[in-house]
Design a protein with these regions (language model features):
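C-terminal motif of bacterial Sec signal peptides marking the signal peptidase cleavage site
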Residues: 20-22
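Non-catalytic cap/lid and distal C-terminal segments of serine-dependent acyl enzymes
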Residues: 24-295
Length: 295
């Protein structure tokens, strides 16, 4: 008899989650003030371009060194923000702009709450195609960005860390290096939980039903198990030891090692915040510069 009552309860919980989700959207606070931290010898611009994949205009922030020689092309690092953030976050909450002084273009796209994937139930929300096709084409058309895999890298925090690793595994021909900082790598494989029903509903819209093909196609663990170690971008992973995301990061680091996929993993002190992420930047960029093609 108890089992007969489960379905109505789940339906009720889903209904409540939908109502709460609608209320949340109406009560969304305005974005925080934009106060980018710029280095002395860099130039910053905010760009809006039309994404064919999303069929709407999307913004991105770009930071370049000021002393670019004529006709010179520079490598590009795409920086993905976390959930609840926006394309200003990297330049507002870190001093990442200083790395552009080393002959590097930094591109920070708007990712909304997409996990940088093509949504399962919304054909118009093709965020993977927006990043991997539209954004890169716009950057390489309008800025001195060197084309080709040896000149491209991708890095992200939290949701953006998931996006960076997922995109690198799905498109090994696009990137030479990918870094995931405090990455939410296990989101597609998390089972249903009443305690997180609203989050599960959001994720189901992005990744599809539990154990669906779409969900498996965007699961970094599934992708890592089938990846070609000779073609996979170099993967840099780090995670704070006080984070709930640490176990999943440890697990995928072990999987990458077992599969002989070039990678490194650096757990360290800290929680899921910019204090910890900023402490990891020097090490992450040292690894990045060791793999990018720079002339």
């Amino acid at each position: 008899m108890k089992s007969e009552n489960i379905l109505p309860c789940v339906v009720l919980c889903l209904s409540v989650a939908l109502v709460l989700g609608a209320c949340e959207k109406k009560a969304t606070p305005p974005p925080p003030p934009d106060h980018p931290r710029l280095a002395p010898n860099v130039l910053m611009r905010d760009i809006t371009f039309h994404s064919a994949a999303l069929n709407r205009n999307m913004p991105y922030r770009i930071i370049l060194p000021t002393n670019i020689a004529a006709e010179k092309k520079l490598p590009v690092l795409y920086l993905l923000h976390g959930g609840g953030g926006n394309f200003h976050d990297w330049s507002n909450y870190s001093d990442v702009a200083r790395f552009a002084e080393n002959g590097l273009i930094l591109v920070m796209p708007e990712g909304e709450s997409s996990y940088y994937t093509n949504a399962a139930d919304r054909p118009q929300d093709r965020y993977e195609d927006y990043i991997a096709t539209d954004l890169m084409a716009d950057v390489e058309q309008h800025f001195p960005a060197a084309p080709g895999r040896p000149n491209r890298a991708i890095m992200g925090i939290s949701m953006g860390g998931f996006g960076a690793v997922n995109l690198a595994l799905k498109h090994p021909d696009l990137f030479i290096f990918a870094a995931g900082i405090s990455s939410a790598l296990d989101v597609p494989s998390r089972p249903f939980s009443i305690k997180r029903i609203q989050q599960y509903h959001q994720h189901a819209g992005i990744f599809g039903p539990w154990k669906s093909e779409h969900r498996r196609a965007n699961d970094p663990f599934v992708l890592a198990r089938s990846a070609d170690p000779t073609r996979t971008p170099y993967l840099y992973l780090t995670c704070g030891e006080q984070e709930g995301l640490l176990p999943a990061n440890r697990q995928i680091a072990a999987l990458l090692k077992d599969r002989h996929i070039p990678s490194e993993f650096h757990p360290g002190p800290g929680a899921h915040d910019w204090n910890q992420w900023n402490r990891r930047l020097d090490d992450a960029f040292q690894s990045l510069f060791a793999h990018l093609q720079r002339k």
